[in-house]
Amino acid sequence: MKIREVTDCKKEYLALLLLADEQEDMVDRYLERGTMYVLEDGGVKAECVVTDEGDGILELKNIAVKPDCQGKGYGKALVDFLVQTYVGQYTVLQVGTGDSPSTIPFYESCGFRRHHLVKNFFTDHYDHPIYECGVHLVDMVYLQREI
């Protein structure tokens, strides 16, 4: 397993990015200013994008694992990689996600704790309703962990 930074042609991984953020113009808002990594294990299995949000905060804007590779530790490996890579450069790793039964437990298992909520984020910023595991996403839940 190898994790490497992607510095150009980030849109080559659009199909994977859209697994985590299904509206392309929302991905475009952070993709170019963000730092992107892919996890390879006999081919690309997962990706993540992080951005500098100031005040010592690194935000995980997008993390996705190919559907047939989920549950194999690739997502956790990316989070662990980010913590190891950015320790000393940032004090907090944060992520914003929907209040979904598939994402919140994953982030909590990676050491994140709920921090704050942005009301109506998904209804205000997406042009269509977003559903995850049958749950209509409305509010953005922010979780943080120290690094």
Where are these regions (language model features)?
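Acetyl-CoA-dependent GNAT
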Residues: 4-67, 79
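Conserved N-terminal entry element of GNAT/NAT acetyltransferase domains
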Residues: 1-9, 141, 147
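Conserved catalytic-core motifs of GNAT/GCN5-like acyltransferases
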Residues: 94-96, 108, 113-134
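Conserved GNAT acetyl-CoA-binding A-motif
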Residues: 86-98
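Short hydrophobic/aromatic beta-strand or adjacent loop that forms the aromatic wall/cage
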Residues: 34-36, 137-142
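Conserved acetyl-CoA pyrophosphate-binding loop and the N-cap/start of the following alpha-helix
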Residues: 69, 73-81
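Short secondary-structure capping/turn micro-motifs that flank functional sites
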Residues: 33, 101-102, 122-124
